[in-house]
Curated annotation (Swiss-Prot):
It is a multi-pass membrane protein. The gene is PRM1. Glycans are attached at residues 133, 143, 195, 229, 250, 277, 293, 447, 466, 482, 488, 507, 549, 560, 565, 576. Residues 43-103, 318-405, 628-643 are cytoplasmic. It comes from the Eukaryota. The chain crosses the membrane at residues 22-42, 104-124, 297-317, 406-426, 607-627. Belongs to the PRM1 family. GO terms for cellular component: mating projection tip; plasma membrane. GO terms for biological process: plasma membrane fusion involved in cytogamy. The keyword Membrane applies. It comes from Kluyveromyces lactis (strain ATCC 8585 / CBS 2359 / DSM 70799 / NBRC 1267 / NRRL Y-1140 / WM37). This is Plasma membrane fusion protein PRM1. InterPro entries: PRM1 (IPR026777). It is found in: Cell membrane.
Amino acid sequence: MGHIYLKLNERLSQIWCNKYTIIILVMMVKILLFIKMLSNGFENIMDYTMENCRNIDYYYSKYVNSSPHYMGLMGNFLIQKSMEQSVALSLKSISLLVSVSENVIDFMIDLWLGTWVCLIVSAIDGSVDVATNATESVIDLVNGTVSSVADEIDDGLSGLTKVVNKVLSAVNDIQNFFKGNDDESDINDQVKKVNLTINGLRTLSIPSSIDDKLVKLSANTPDFDTVKNKTKQAIAVPFDIIRNEIKSINASKLVGDPQYLEVPAIDTSGVKICSDNKSEINEVFDTIRKVFNASTMTILIVFILAALSLIVYNAWAEWRQWIRLKRFRDQYRHQTIMLKNPFDDMADEKVPQNVDILETYHLVFNRYQSGFGRWLSRRISSKLETQRNIQWLVTYLTSSTSLTLLALGLCGILMCCVQFAIIAIISNKINGKETEKMMTSMSTAMNDTVQQGMTDWSKSANLYINDTETQINRQVFGWIQNTTDTVNGTVTDLIEDIDNAISKAFNGTILYKPMDTVMQCVIGNKLEAISTALTWVHNTAQVNLPRVNGSELYQQLQQNLTDSNSTTSSTAELPNSTSIATQLKDNLISAANKILSQYKNTVVIELIVSSVFLALYFFQIPVAGIILAAQKHKSKHNNQNRP
């Protein structure tokens, strides 16, 4: 071959495996492996989900397909028992109201009739007492006074009679003397007439039978006992009938027909939340798979282009380096020729000592580092020693060893940024609208199934309630019509009986009209009010039972479950259709986020390692400073020891 070094074409044959391309390829493989591991993790999640579809469907059917059935059983039992208890309590309340009403009516009748009797008795007894006392006083006065006066007159007239008789005897004698005895009979007749008149006055008296008539009027004052007894007996008849009817009622038979309480059958249609939504689940994972594929293709294209670009750059760099090598060779030959003394036999040994071949090599093969060092040193200082120290520091920091630390640190940080970006993209997809849309569709299907079952059950429950309401209104409150009609008739009869009693007692007297007016004010108006009240009860007595609203019941159930879950621990939460879909979504997202979190932790560790490499690179700066200080101290010490 003639030479032991590599020429340009031989160097270019190895350009594909340069260190920069190798680093790029290693980074590409690392990121591709990272993407592959993420993809495998999500594939495992999808496989696990699909493999457990049967279990998910089983628990879903237990909740959704069976819930309306068991809720219907529970609800029907509660409705039936509540209806029976409501009817029983209603009957008991009605029975109490019947007794209260009867007693109130009896009390009011006693109150009103008692008031009426009191008014009448007070008026009549007072009048009779006054009249009787006045009559007795007059009779006693008349009878006693006339007899006494007659006796006194009779005593007075006896003396007068003697005088008159003596006068009459004298007159009679004179008359007989002159005329004879013709008029003697006239004088005797006049005297006898006087005596007869006084005797008649003695026999004058007021008969005591007038007191008997007043006592009889007082005794005949009406007390309405017959009317009250008759009214109470008439009032008690319908109330007794009602009480007996209420006692004979069986509350369990009064409620509606239990056949209306339909129990939703357990749904065996095979609706499955997981199996029926495999397409949506696959769609979510397909979206994530597309992200992985797109990321893989992007990484491949970018890194392959970068590797090709570095290959081209290194080919150009190799060509430039080959030119510099040839220049270095020519420069070395030129310096050797220029420094060689043709008259000195030892010139071949002295020339290399005047040439710093290592510095020349550095200037040729580290062109950019040396150029940057010269530029930086001239900007910082004009002293030659300081400039050379700065150039040495740049050379130290840009050596292949130091640049290896810098490359590892920067490439590691770059790979971590790429991996973080991939994790962020996948996380956004998982927590994005696609997953939310899938879970919303599943939740809607579950809600529709449960709500339809609740609606069907509420319809059957309302039929049962309708039948119960009809039975109650017909068999319980239907009696009120008969009762109110009977009581109204009794009130009418009571008014007629009172009128008859007043008419019988006072008709044809001056007390009839006042007593009739008093009766109307005291009793008649109240009886008319009772009649009006009974008519109102007759028209309004009915029961209206509330109906079951399936939609409202379902919404309230969901709200109660939500409120209950918000105030209880997670282990005590009650599942509902929304929470099942949410839980499924949360489980999928949680599993995916757990994988992403694990890989994120791995990337964080890689970032820490890369940062350590970068810190080690910057640690070279104080090390270089220490070396410069040591060299300066050594140089100063050597100069002092030099003679």
